[in-house]
Each structure stands twice: as C-alpha cells, then as structure tokens.
C-alpha cells in the first residue's frame, strides 16, 4: 500500500487552526496542482459535528471558489477536523489562509439558510444532515483562535 502524506504527519505537533501545503503535483505538461490541509480544529482534541461540517463544506465550495483562482475542490477530512483544498497553481499558504478567514467571516456574519447551496433531496446526497447554526458557531470559534499560515508556529493572518 502506498504511503499517504497526511498519515505520516505527526498530529501531536500541529497547532490548529492553520493552512498547510501538503504537496504540489506537476503534470506532464508542467501544470501544477497544490493540495492544502485546512485544519480548523486541533486533531484528537475536537471534531466538527457532521451537520456543521457538511454545511461549511457546501459554503466553502462557493466562497473559496470566489476567492482563490484555480479552485478545484475542497473536501472534508474523515476525522472531521478540516478539509483538503485542491487548486491549480501554487498559491501561498498566506493567501489561502486569508481566503479561508474571509470565507469563515462571511459564514459567521452574513450567510442565511437560503444562501446555503445544495440542501435539497435533488442537490445533495445527505440533505437532511446540515446545520447552519453549527457552521456559524464553529466559524466563530475558529476565527477567535485565528488562522495561521504555519502548522507548527502560530502565525495568524490578518
């Protein structure tokens, strides 16, 4: 079985919330895809409940797409502590952290239920498992701690 980078990471050494560049893959024609770890809560200390995480996922799909050129996908970790973000190109962790901060601020301050995409039986595979209340609470808590552009040293972005 191939090695998976995130399983090699010492989860006891990181200091969430943070943005971490996992890898940059280069295609045969030189195109690059960056994979980021958007860690919202401290591993093995907490986990975002599925309803809140699911709603944050649906909202980040649009909010990060609006803020990051080359956005491909943002998918939750099974451990429910954050997300993988895939983008074309090589944006800095600082730029990604600032975009994430802005997106979470919008969730916390502006988003209403009617703004959440993909919440019907036709548009979501588990449409009953959403919680905007939880998404707003978690966004508030994450923002209060600040989002670092370094996983090991707290370097909170403005």
From Swiss-Prot:
It catalyses: S-(5-deoxy-D-ribos-5-yl)-L-homocysteine = (S)-4,5-dihydroxypentane-2,3-dione + L-homocysteine. GO terms for molecular function: iron ion binding; S-ribosylhomocysteine lyase activity. Transmembrane segments: none annotated. It is an enzyme of class 4 (lyase). Binds 1 Fe cation per subunit. Involved in the synthesis of autoinducer 2 (AI-2) which is secreted by bacteria and is used to communicate both the cell density and the metabolic potential of the environment. The regulation of gene expression in response to changes in cell density is called quorum sensing. Catalyzes the transformation of S-ribosylhomocysteine (RHC) to homocysteine (HC) and 4,5-dihydroxy-2,3-pentadione (DPD). This is S-ribosylhomocysteine lyase.
